[in-house]
């Protein structure tokens, strides 16, 4: 079974990816892991990627696509299937993935799209606060401190609402064309992410069991 998982930051994609890999015994192919392995093994694409990373530059699409192709060419993929997580990030990468799968005689069986309302995600992701003296982490809504005084707490730049909103907006702008692309192929299965973690996985499990 060859799968792709998608979802906005904070939607629980990483948690559900781990559950899918564990339950269905497919290879978990995440962008970070692929890059680390390719660089450690000094593959052709890994060496190229490292040259950009060492200069503090973004790795070009053709190198990222090449690293994905190297990983999908490995023997375990035909035996176990895979779950792609964190790739493709752009519609151009999605088209490159289509071409790679065709060249390797592979095909996607399904795209799991974890849907959560962006406003809920904004509240979830921008609520983290840190106590100035102890460094303890709390959440304004889900785990508020008993003795909250605003001056005793601070937020990291990454957690500020305007920063989180920008990140969500970028992810929506990049992700929606990819979802539309796979929806036209009849591959997308929408899963409601605004529920208990185990309920989300039950919904995914039901979809994937029917795909097998």
Curated annotation (Swiss-Prot):
Residues 127-159 are annotated as: LID. The keyword Kinase applies. One of its GO terms (biological process) is AMP salvage. SUPFAM superfamilies: P-loop containing nucleoside triphosphate hydrolases. It is found in: Cytoplasm. GO terms for cellular component: cytoplasm. It catalyses: AMP + ATP = 2 ADP. Its EC number is 2.7.4.3. GO terms for molecular function: adenylate kinase activity; ATP binding. PROSITE patterns: ADENYLATE_KINASE. Residues 30-59 are annotated as: NMP. Transmembrane segments: none annotated. ATP binds at residues 10-15, 128, 137-138, 195. Belongs to the adenylate kinase family. Catalyzes the reversible transfer of the terminal phosphate group between ATP and AMP. Plays an important role in cellular energy homeostasis and in adenine nucleotide metabolism. Consists of three domains, a large central CORE domain and two small peripheral domains, NMPbind and LID, which undergo movements during catalysis. The LID domain closes over the site of phosphoryl transfer upon ATP binding. Assembling and dissambling the active center during each catalytic cycle provides an effective means to prevent ATP hydrolysis. Monomer. This is Adenylate kinase. It comes from Streptococcus sanguinis (strain SK36).
């Amino acid at each position: 079974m060859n799968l792709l998982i998608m979802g906005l930051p904070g939607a629980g994609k990483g948690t559900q990816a781990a559950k899918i890999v564990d339950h269905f015994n497919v290879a978990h192919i995440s962008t970070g892991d692929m890059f680390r392995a390719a660089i450690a093994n000094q593959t052709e694409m890994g060496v190229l990627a490292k040259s950009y990373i060492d200069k503090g530059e973004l790795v070009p699409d053709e190198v990222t696509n090449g690293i994905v192709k190297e990983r999908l060419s490995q023997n375990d993929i035909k035996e176990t299937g895979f779950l792609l997580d964190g790739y493709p990030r752009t519609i151009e990468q999605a088209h490159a993935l289509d071409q790679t799968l065709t060249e390797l005689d592979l095909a996607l069986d399904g795209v799991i799209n974890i849907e959560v309302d962006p406003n809920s995600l904004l509240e979830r992701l921008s609520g983290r606060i840190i106590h100035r003296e102890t460094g303890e982490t709390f959440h304004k809504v889900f785990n508020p401190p008993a003795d909250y005084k605003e001056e005793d707490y601070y937020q990291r730049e990454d957690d500020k609402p305007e920063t989180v909103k920008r990140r969500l907006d970028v992810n929506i702008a990049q992700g929606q064309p990819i979802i539309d692309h796979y929806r036209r192929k009849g591959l997308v299965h929408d899963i409601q992410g605004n529920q208990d973690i185990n309920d989300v996985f039950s919904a995914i499990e039901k979809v994937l069991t029917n795909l097998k």
